[in-house]
Amino acid sequence: MSQGGGLNILSIQSSVAYGHVGNSAAVFPLQRLGIEVWAVNTVHFSNHTGYGEWRGPVLAAGDVSEVLRGIGERGVLGSCGAVLSGYMGDVSLGEVILGAVGRVRGANPQALFCCDPVMGDEGRGFFVRPGIPRFMRERAVPAADVVTPNQFELEYLAGVEVRTLGGALAAAEKVLGLGPGTVLVTSLRRRDAGEEGRIEMLAATREGAWLVGTPLLPLEVNGAGDATAALFLGHLLLGRGLEEALSLTASSVYAVLEKTLRRGAREIQLVAAQESLVAPPVRFPVRRVA
């Protein structure tokens, strides 16, 4: 995976003052990896919406566009190695993000676009506005180099149910057929895993697929997927191979979640577990599955 023109990532996501989701979950892990982050916030909430109550503004697509325009006017887009996107409030914001990706690629053709296609999850279904799922499948994912769906999002993008490893591989192949070069399934639970109490990540390219599993912790938190996408992209930008990036990402995220569980915290403990972002204490092995 090419490093592009520099260790700088343009991250266009939501932001919260309290807790860790969106940019508030992505920026710090990337910085701990030694990567500069140009964070452009799409909302600025008091806390994430999982609490049921929150305050703060949603930025209009035009305001986000102005911030991105200002960054471009600094003449630095040629040193941007990647663009990272997450939750998109509406289709107009999605168009702004794709416009920014186009300008970055115009300045640095080797820049990566990592799209975390946030749409929903198992049990909750879709939680985004109408039009976003279709925009993700027809516009954002085809434009991306890397996509990081959870299992629910993988099923939607591929148009198939995923219950086995073979099903997951077939679904990942369908998503690769939409355009991206790498698919990271951030949370895979399958009937044929052979062991209860585990959760897996699956990384697939046109050359093969790799799987890593970790213990499934009794924990319900927000932001782990945002941190996962950021770490995986960061390791790729640093020039690490897919297998190493997968192992490091899964191992770091597990360490963060384990720390969160031990502390009985509602928010992922990125700061308390920050050494694990760089050097996870336990490295989970990766095996090739295709």
Swiss-Prot record:
Catalytic reaction(s) noted: pyridoxal + ATP = pyridoxal 5'-phosphate + ADP + H(+)
SUPFAM superfamilies per UniProt: Ribokinase-like
Cofactor: Mg(2+)
Entry keywords, A to Z: ATP-binding, Kinase, Magnesium, Nucleotide-binding, Transferase
The keyword Transferase is annotated on this UniProt entry: yes
Subunit-level organization: Homodimer.
Family membership noted in the UniProt record: Belongs to the pyridoxine kinase family. PdxY subfamily.
Task performed by this protein: Pyridoxal kinase involved in the salvage pathway of pyridoxal 5'-phosphate (PLP). Catalyzes the phosphorylation of pyridoxal to PLP.
Protein name: Pyridoxal kinase PdxY
